[in-house]
């Protein structure tokens, strides 16, 4: 359906679609002279797509890593803070609306893996498939694991990661030991954060709400406004008297 619609500007938050067809859709949009915007597809309210495409476009990005799924992060945060087991933390996430009735994609890392595929394309200009992402979820993470990590000075976080070396992308989503002094260790509950390394800027980090209707809505409306500005600029070229109010 989106392929048929791509003759007009398209705004989507559908990460399932983009993780499989992003390159095709971008090529179609370019050939048809229209915009394809998808800020809400990665990390909710964090403007990471715009940051990579525009703010960091003077850099060669070698690595990104981050907390890309709010449900999993909420569960791990609750297990750590309240010393509860995975099942009870998941029940609470579902009760509060942070987890779906079927949480499989979130807790098994599939949702985060889709975001890694999209972010790898943006960061490295390389197409990878979901099956290329080394994937381990958090359903097997126990309270004993969390406490053992704590005694060593670490927290367990579900980390999505992509690195670009020698023309190849290495991508993974897996529970990872993050030292308590690292910025990612302080990211709690439904919040997301993405750590990006560029050759000019060095280390950068983006933080914010990764889920929720307002965070997602903010990203979608931002895309809508950007498309409107593109349209205004084009129309003003044809008709200088026109100005978008």
Task: Describe each model-derived feature in a short phrase.
Residues 219, 224-245:
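A conserved regulatory-domain signal marking ACT and ACT-like small-molecule sensing domains
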Residues 138, 202-204, 208-214:
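Glycine-rich phosphate/pyrophosphate-binding beta-alpha loops
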Residues 2, 6, 15-54:
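Rossmann-fold NAD(P)-binding glycine/threonine-rich loop
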Residues 10-13, 36-40, 63-66, 206:
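General beta-strand structural signal in soluble alpha/beta enzymes
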Residues 54-108, 112-119:
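Conserved anion/nucleotide-ligand pocket segment
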Residues 82-85, 123-130, 228-233:
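Short helix-capping/linker segments at secondary-structure and domain boundaries
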Residues 90-186, 191-193:
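Substrate-binding/catalytic subdomain of NAD(P)-dependent oxidoreductase enzymes
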């Amino acid at each position: 359906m989106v392929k048929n619609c791509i003759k007009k500007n398209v705004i989507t938050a559908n990460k399932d679609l983009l993780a499989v067809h992003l390159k095709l859709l971008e090529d179609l949009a370019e050939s048809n002279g229209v915009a394809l915007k998808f800020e809400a597809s990665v990390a909710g309210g964090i403007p990471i797509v715009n940051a990579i495409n525009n703010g960091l476009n003077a850099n060669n990005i070698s690595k990104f890593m981050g907390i890309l799924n709010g449900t999993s992060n909420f569960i791990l945060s609750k297990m750590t803070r309240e010393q509860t087991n995975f099942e009870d933390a998941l029940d609470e996430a579902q009760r509060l609306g942070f987890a779906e009735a079927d949480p499989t994609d979130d807790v098994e890392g599939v949702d985060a893996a889709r975001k890694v595929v999209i972010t790898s394309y943006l960061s490295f200009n390389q197409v990878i498939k979901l099956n290329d992402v080394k994937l381990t979820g958090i359903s097997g993470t126990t309270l004993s694991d969390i406490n053992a990590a704590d005694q060593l000075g670490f927290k367990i976080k579900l980390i999505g990661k992509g690195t670009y070396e020698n023309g190849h992308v290495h991508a993974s989503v897996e529970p990872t030991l993050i030292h308590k002094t690292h910025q990612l260790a302080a990211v709690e509950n439904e919040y997301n954060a993405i750590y990006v390394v560029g050759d000019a800027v060095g280390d950068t980090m983006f933080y914010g709400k990764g889920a929720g209707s307002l965070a997602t809505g903010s990203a979608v409306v931002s895309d809508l406004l950007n498309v409107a500005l593109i349209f205004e600029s084009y129309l003003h070229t044809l008709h200088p008297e026109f100005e978008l109010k």
